[in-house]
Amino acid sequence: MLLIREIMHCKPGKVRPMVEKSLAMSKLMDKHGMGRMRISTDLAGERYWTVVMEMESPSLGDFDKMMKGEGMTEDAGKEFEKIMQGYHDLVDFGRREIFRIEG
């Protein structure tokens, strides 16, 4: 099992809108059987205004299929697009980390 962390460093004052988008995305993922994301914000760290979205995936192949929207209905794809519309305006910098869960 893999742990995928999407780390978004938001622009000043844009953490709350990014959290709201992430929570809506998590609910939609759960609704469509893709699992839920865990959403976290920083209390202290290397950079301020950080939002972390964590999810689990059985394999890189499964994660890749999810990112491509394979098996998703057209309506679900449109819902995802609507939720994430404009998120680039909220984010200054981002990265993805992938870990193997050992126990």
Task: State each model region's role.
Residues 41-47, 87:
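A short beta-turn/loop motif at secondary-structure boundaries
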Residues 9-20:
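Short, surface-exposed ligand-recognition loops at beta-strand->loop->(often short) alpha-helix junctions
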Residues 94-102:
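Long, low-complexity, Ser/Thr/Gly/Pro-rich intrinsically disordered segments that act as flexible linkers
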Residues 20-38, 56-95:
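An amphipathic, aromatic/His-enriched active-site/gating alpha helix that lines ligand/cofactor pockets
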